[in-house]
């Protein structure tokens, strides 16, 4: 489905830049016949979305999301973790879910948006302002060890190569991998 060209989501224009034109990007949507995942046909350079603009979505600003994340984290702790296990979140945003592991576990977040990571760091959540790459996964494994739990929330929609992304986990995983996504697996 071709929906034309649009400015990036979350790229609000300041008053001083109102006369400047927003860059436009193609919005063409496709669906995988096999798994039914809906995704963009043209990939926008991730730097355009996460590095060149102030990313505006903060998980901590979403009403009741922390309650959901607490329930989710409590379930993971009960079923899979022992004290001091390493927990890694990819696309951790400002650390809302990681805060529920902070007391008894070694935690690390990875998120490419620097302004979001600054908020996580202010909350005492160790977070790397990076894209999750093969190089970074090896670095984390070397410096932090293997993760007992790796998870992400609503990140799949932001990936341009899911298979390549998932391959990076082989360097890090020592336990469970969780991915919270918004598509029906039926």
Where are these regions (language model features)?
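Conserved SAM-binding loop of SAM-dependent methyltransferases across substrates and taxa
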Residues: 94-105
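A conserved beta-strand element that flanks and buttresses the S-adenosyl-L-methionine
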Residues: 148-151
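A short glycine-rich, Lys/Arg-flanked "PGG" loop and its adjoining helix->strand segment in the class I
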Residues: 163-178
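N-terminal juxtadomain amphipathic helix
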Residues: 1-63
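Conserved SAM-binding strand-loop segment of SAM-dependent methyltransferases
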Residues: 123-139
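Short, glycine-/aromatic-enriched active-site segment of Class I SAM-dependent methyltransferases
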Residues: 8, 177-186
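Conserved class I S-adenosyl-L-methionine
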Residues: 83-93
């Amino acid at each position: 489905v071709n929906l034309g060209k649009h400015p990036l989501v979350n790229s609000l224009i300041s008053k001083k830049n109102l006369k400047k034109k927003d860059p436009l990007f193609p919005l063409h949507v496709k669906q995988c016949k096999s798994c039914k995942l809906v995704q963009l046909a043209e990939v926008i350079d991730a730097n355009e979305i996460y590095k060149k603009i102030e990313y505006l979505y903060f998980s901590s600003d979403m009403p009741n999301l922390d309650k959901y994340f607490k329930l989710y984290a409590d379930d993971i702790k009960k079923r899979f973790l022992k004290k001091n296990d390493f927990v890694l979140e990819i696309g951790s945003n400002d650390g809302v879910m990681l805060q529920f592991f902070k007391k008894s576990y070694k935690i690390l977040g990875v998120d490419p948006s620097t302004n979001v990571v600054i908020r996580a760091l202010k909350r005492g959540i160790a977070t790397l302002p990076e894209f999750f790459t093969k190089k970074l996964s090896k670095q984390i494994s070397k410096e932090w060890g293997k993760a007992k739990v790796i998870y992400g929330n609503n990140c799949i929609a932001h990936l341009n190569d899911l298979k390549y992304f998932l391959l990076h986990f082989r360097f890090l995983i020592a336990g469970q991998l969780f991915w919270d996504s918004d598509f029906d697996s039926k």
